[in-house]
Design a protein with these regions (language model features):
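Alpha/beta-hydrolase-fold enzymes
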Residues: 100, 111-187
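Gly/Ala-rich beta-loop-alpha elbow adjacent to hydrolase catalytic centers
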Residues: 97-101, 105
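Short, surface-exposed "cap/lid" segments of acyl-processing enzymes
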Residues: 6-63
Length: 297
């Protein structure tokens, strides 16, 4: 719980920014941390009409044993609790996320029909098919079905770690290798965790046509983890109106990479277009310079 009585998950990594009437719930990625959404949360809060909530998913910001002890329904249950509390405080609530968090935002909308004002989907991850992914990765779903298959699979984060900004990439690499999981996330991901992602994605894909809320889908054409196929799939199958925008000069982690200001600008505009509350346009050129460290407050 934070000072506002909102459940932000385990530990102290989750945060709330802003004090506006529109609520925005952002969900971090698999093996990730709330920190990867801090820059976007700060930018949206500066718009003046938003309060942004970023919880920690169950099993995250610890070690792999913590993560393996949880499944996708545990991750969702924490998000559900936060969403219910945020909805009690705000007439309009937008939900979004990065990577797996974008997929989970769709699940939230499907579980709470008529209660989500819109979706903010960053680098949606329905399958790992980016240019840095091993070409045999397509076999992973098959291995997940073989007895003990999940126990022989292990995936390690490798350069460029979803980040084109070389300075930031070096900082993230150091933090991951030094075990600073609450800042940069985990360096490895076990097969059990990957299986949970596949299970959640299968459920969400079936529900997508029934999700009628408007969605902003942002994806990099240079994404090293998940190709634009993922954004195209959302555009084709989501039941509501989709605004898909492809970014250049960044990799998978678009919320912290070289185009994060563009992500803020597009997100703020989308929220303003789909809310009953209006505010002055956010000045994304003001404030902090390009993110120098994932510890940026």
């Amino acid at each position: 719980m934070n000072a506002q009585g909102i459940d932000l998950g385990e530990g102290t990594a989750g945060f709330v920014l802003g004090d506006g009437p529109v609520g925005i719930l952002l969900i971090h990625g698999l093996t990730g941390t709330p920190t990867e959404l801090r820059q976007v949360a700060k930018g949206l809060a500066k718009a003046g009409n938003c309060t942004v909530y970023v919880p920690t998913l169950a099993g995250h910001c610890g070690d792999n044993s913590d993560l393996q002890a949880t499944g996708w329904q545990d991750w969702y249950e924490g998000v559900r609790k936060t969403f219910v509390q945020v909805k009690q405080r705000h007439a309009q609530v937008f939900v979004g996320g990065l990577s797996m968090g974008a997929v989970m935002s769709m699940y939230v909308a499907s579980e709470h029909p008529g209660q989500v004002a819109g979706l903010l989907m960053y680098s949606t991850t329905l399958k790992y098919d980016g240019w840095s992914i091993n070409k045999l990765a397509f076999l992973t779903p098959l291995l997940m079905k073989i007895p003990f298959g999940v126990h022989i699979c292990s995936f390690e984060e490798k350069p460029p770690y979803g980040i084109k900004n070389e300075r930031l990439r070096a900082i993230v690499e150091r933090q991951m290798k030094e075990g600073e999981s609450s800042e940069a996330g985990l360096l490895t991901m076990e097969g059990i965790t990957v299986r949970e992602l596949h299970r959640m994605n299968a459920v969400v894909k079936k529900r997508m046509p029934q999700i009628k809320v408007p969605a902003l889908v942002l994806h990099s054409i240079e994404d090293d983890i998940t190709s634009r196929w993922n954004a195209d799939y959302v555009e084709r199958h989501l039941g509501g109106p989709v605004t898909k925008i492809l970014l250049d000069n960044c990799y998978h982690m678009i919320t912290v990479d070289l185009q994060y200001r563009r992500v803020i600008e597009l997100s703020a505009r989308f929220v303003e277009q789909h809310t009953v509350f209006k505010s002055t346009r956010i000045n994304v050129g003001a404030g902090s310079p390009a993110m120098a460290s994932l510890r940026s407050a």
